[in-house]
Structures are given as structure tokens and as C-alpha cells.
Amino acid sequence: MAPFPDEVDVFTAPHWRMKQLVGRYCDKLSKTNFSNNNDFRALLQSLYATFKEFKMHEQIENEYIIGLLQQRSQTIYNVHSDNKLSEMLSLFEKGLKNVKNEYEQLNYAKQLKERLEAFTRDFLPHMKEEEEVFQPMLMEYFTYEELKDIKKKVIAQHCSQKDTAELLRGLSLWNQAEERQKVLKYSVDEKADTEAEVSEHSTGITHLPPEVMLSIFSYLNPQELCRCSQVSTKWSQLAKTGSLWKHLYPVHWARGDWYSGPATELDTEPDEEWVRNRKDESRAFQEWDEDADIDESEESAEESVAISIAQMEKRVLHGLIHNVLPYVGTSVKTLVLAYSSAVSSKMVRQILELCPNLEHLDLTQTDISDSAFDSWSWLGCCQSLRHLDLSGCEKITDMALEKISRALGVLTSHQSGFLKSAGKAASTPWTSKDITMPSTTQYACLHNLTDKGIGEEIDNEHSWTEPVSSESLTSPYVWMLDAEDLADIEDAVEWRHRNVESLCVMETASNFGCSSSGCYSKDIVGLRTSVCWQQHCASPAFAYCGHSFCCTGTALRTMTTLPATSAMCRKALRTTLPRGKDLIYFGSEKSDQETGRVLLFLSLSGCYQITDHGLRALTLGGGLPYLEHLNLSGCLTVTGAGLQDLVSACPSLNDEYFYYCDNINGPHADTASGCQNLQCGFRACCRSGE
């Protein structure tokens, strides 16, 4: 209970409200996440409203209490001259208008907490002083009835301003979004007297056409786009427009660099210290134990910073994969994950699956393995790829190159050379009872070669070239089944060798080899299946020649037809593909313009597990006719023969940008640029110990 009668106690009731506001902002301050822009702005708006109410309270006291007391006592002066309210309001306004990013928010938060603590230390004693000093003076200089009248006026003034929202409008407080909206408004009558009249003749930013909003959004960085997506459903849909997300740099974004333009070509590698810092981040993140005791040492503090950076990177990647790429993945052209501390093969696999139209992929110095490319599981699934950098990816093997080559597709000109219609198909079907095979377990299920094409996954988990031991192969024949008249697989048990119709039986003699201009690979095409081709390809009888059919270990594919001039077929095919459906790779006819294997840049620097087998996998489907830059520095196990096979399939290769180990006697030895990894501290090189 107040020490003075309630009817004449002019301070206690208003001060109770002020103390309540102090408690509220202290509570909000302790719970606010200053890294979150929405929380940050909500706190500042709340503080601005609170301190405006403090200011209003001060003005009411000056006019109805202190002013009257000064008229009757000469000892009262400058009671509210140093309460810092104006300075605090100015601080909040600057925060609302000037703070743009998370880094500035965190710096501002530190200053804000210090200033609020100082204000609270002064404000609470100030109210106590008024209650204990000025209230007795009021009792001395004013009558009972005068004090009752003063209190009524003070309470009435406070209540009239109680609606905070109206108070904010009256004092022209607008948050940043409202200010922008106000600027964009146009009014028929600029001298409208009321807010209602203004709104009738104005258009806010939310009413702009989608085309205009999309143009505005194109100037925003990814962080700002994510904020805009939280404004409304309409803005959320616009922010997910693919054209706004063509270029992704999640590693840079996690470190505060929100660049999202086209990839820039850097001629210089980062220095060893920078690379070492990235490795330290990755190591600290992998070794981090959430349940470990906190170590306050300097070394621990450095590791803590590294862990924080890696965690931020992981959050950015997770957000992209689950919240952004499902909507915009088909529009993504550039993905740079170079020197990532947190990226994993699984993450890369998910991203590649969601981004089929990538043109620029940089995975430099990441800890990925072959499984990162498992999503490139069907032919031509990433045929727009022009730039691929796997420098320093030490876990990459030939299997990854096989998947990459498959994803690049097949040249249209390469297909047309040996995918020719063989006339009208014969109508006589073959029956399963006339055919027998020695063992059905040797032959995997054949895929139905229809024109569904690119929309379906046509491969199993094995790569293009999965060598299989030839020891278990008992049949000297390769069976070519008609694609449109396949028997039920259960009927295969009754098949016989006799009366083979609608099959092309090719004997795999030991003298089967390549003859450059007449190489059999030019006459064979089809979709890969797990039939006994793989077993034949493991035979020593097949010598490496760099062609898709002849490479040892290359899984050959089920054929639907062979050219009529082929000497391999003992019996002419009865059934062939209908006219107009010979482009079985893609399921539809394609234009004359090349759409596959357009790779211009390939770096495998430091990928020391790569062998000739992987290089030859890149020659499949027409080679790499547009490749200009090839870096094989640190690929220690490749040979001159393997390099020659690859170079022969890369007619556009520029010797100036062709790098390989100096110890290899390979092609263009006099004009190629040699190894780039000499005395390099973070890439594989045969001379790294020198």
C-alpha cells in the first residue's frame, strides 16, 4: 500500500505501468535471437513503442505535476533533463533503418544491451525518487482537492495514449517495410486530409504486378530473398522463381558472402594457409562432440570458431536441399562447393538429383567419393555440363568418371552414325518354346526398350563399366533380343538353342578386335543392361582401343538392331525398331544441334586413384569434342596410352591448358603444360616430397 492516500498519490499508478514495461523489455531482450532478422526487428519496434510511452509519461509529468510544483517551489528544476530517452529512441531508429545483415545485428545487439542496462539502472531509481521526494512536496504545497484533481488529469492523459498501435502511427513510426511501401504509394489527391482518403487513391508494393516484383527481386541476394519469402504467400511463390536461383555458392554464403552472380574464373589457386584453415574447419567439425566438457583454452576457442563456421555451412546446405532446390533445382546453372568443410557425398548426390541442368560444377578439395554421383544414374541426365572441377577430391575413382561420362549423354551425330532404321519390321513373332539357353542365371533381366526414354531410370546400381570375371561364362554367344517382342522371363527356362528367330547371335571369337575405321563399336548401340556382355568384356581377348565397344571392362549394351552390312550377324534380324524410333537413348527425336557432351573444362588434379580405365570411360558416346581445358596433374597411375586414347577423343583440347604428370611419356609432350601440383602442399603429386 502506498504511504499516501490513494486519492492523492499521483505517482504510484503511472509508475506501476512504467515498471511493468521495464520488466517486459528486459524479458524480451533475454529471449531475442539477434541472428534472426524478424526477431531483431520485432524487438526494436517493441522497444521503440515502450520508450515512446516513457516519453509520453515524462511529458505528462512535466505538464501536470512538475510544472505546477515549480510554480510553488523554487527548488524544483531540470527534473527530466538527463533521462536519456531521446538518445535511446534515436538508437532504435538507427537500428531499424541502418542494420542490414546478421553481422551488423550482432554488433548492434551488444551496444543495445549495454545502453538498456545503463538506462534501467538510472530509470528505476528516478521513479523511486519521485515517489519518495516529490510526493511529500506535493502534499505540502497543494491541497487535498487539488491533488485529487491533478491525479485525475494524470491518469486520464495516460489512458488516452494507451493504444500503442495508434501511438506509433501518431508519432510517424514506420518499420522499414512500411517506409518502402509509403514511398511507392501514389495518390490522386496529394493533399488528402485523412489516412482513409490516401488509401483509396494509392497502390502499395503488394499490389504491383508479378513481373515488376520479379524484376525487383532480381536485385536481391539469397538472404534477402529468403526474408522476402516470409512476408506473404505471394512473395513466397515469387521468391521461389527459378531465374532468381541460377548460381549457388553455399560455402561463401555460410561465411557472409552473398554473391549470387555467374561463376568467375580464377587463374590462381588459394594459398596453402587458406586451404589449411578449411581443412581445420572440416577436421574440427568431424571430431566435434556435443557432450564433451567445455575447454576454455585458446586452442579450444579456435576450434570452436571452426566448428561454428562448419555448422553454419551445414545449415545452409540443408536449407538449400530441403527448402529451395525442390522448387528451383531445374533452373540452377552454377553450383560451387569448393573447399567445403561440411559437404558430404550424400548432400552432393541429393543436389545433383535436384539440379539436372547444371552447367558449372565445382567440388574442389571436398571429401566426396564416387557415391556422390549415384544420382547420375541414366544416360544424358546432365548433358548441359560445361565445367567440372574435381581438383583435390582424393576419393574419386574410375567409377565416378563412368557415371559422369554416362550423364554427359551421347552426341547426336555419334548416334546417327549407327542408329539407323532397318526397314519395316517383320510381323512374324517368335515363340519362346523354340529357344533354349544354357543357364538363365547368367543373364540379367532385359529392360524394355521403349520410347519412354529419359524419364525413367534405366540402370541398376552398377556403373557403365563393371568388369565381371569371365570364368563363369559358358556360352560363346551374345544374344540380341528384339526390344518390342520380349517373352516372359519365366518362359526362358524352356528356351532352346534351336530355331533361333528374331535373334542376332554373335560369336565372341578371340580374334575379335578393333580396326580403327571399321571398329565394331560404330555399329553397336543400345541401352546398357546386366547381360553377359560384362563377362565377355573382361576377357583378355579384348584389347584397349579407346572405343566404347572394345574397351576392356566396358559393359556393353543390349542391341535392338545391327546395320545390315555388319559381318557379325549370322542371321538377319526379323524384327527391328520402327522408323522414327531409332533414337532410343533419349526416347524422342532430337534436332541437329548437339545437346550432349559439351564439357569445356575438366580438372581431376590430385585425383590419384584415376586410371586409364576411367579416362577411356570419358571417350564413350562420342568423346569430349568441345573440351579445351584438361588437368590431370597428380593422376599418378594413368599411362601414356590412356592419355592418348582420351586426347584422341578431344579434338578441341588446347595444349596450353592440358596438364599431366611430368613423369608420363604422353601425347603433346612438347606443348602440354606439365604438372601443376609440383611442390604443392595440398594436392597429390609424385614429386611432393622433393
Swiss-Prot record:
Cofactor names: [2Fe-2S] cluster
Tissue: Ubiquitously expressed. Highly expressed in early embryogenesis with expression decreasing as the embryo progresses through development (E11 and E15).
Region entry Hemerythrin-like, spans: 1-159
Post-translational modifications reported in the UniProt record: Polybiquitinated upon iron and oxygen depletion, leading to its degradation by the proteasome. Ubiquitination is regulated by the hemerythrin-like region that acts as an oxygen and iron sensor. Undergoes constitutive ubiquitin-dependent degradation at the steady state by HERC2.
PROSITE patterns in UniProt: FBOX (PS50181)
GO CC entries: nucleus; perinuclear region of cytoplasm; SCF ubiquitin ligase complex
Reported phenotype of the disruption mutant: FBXL5-deletion mice die during early embryogenesis. FBXL5-null embryos accumulate excess ferrous iron and are exposed to damaging levels of oxidative stress. Simultaneous inactivation of both the FBXL5 and IRP2 genes is sufficient to rescue embryonic lethality.
Activity control summary: An iron-sulfur cluster promotes IRP2 polyubiquitination and degradation in response to both iron and oxygen concentrations.
InterPro entries assigned to the protein according to its UniProt record, in alphabetical order: F-box-like_dom_sf, F-box_dom, F-box_LRR-repeat, Hemerythrin-like, Hr_FBXL5, Leu-rich_rpt, Leu-rich_rpt_Cys-con_subtyp, LRR_dom_sf
Residues that hold [2Fe-2S] cluster according to the record: C661, C675, C685, C686
Subunit structure: Part of a SCF (SKP1-cullin-F-box) protein ligase complex. Interacts with ACO1/IRP1, IREB2/IRP2; the interaction depends on the [2Fe-2S] cluster. Interacts with DCTN1/p150-glued.
Protein's name according to its UniProt entry: F-box/LRR-repeat protein 5
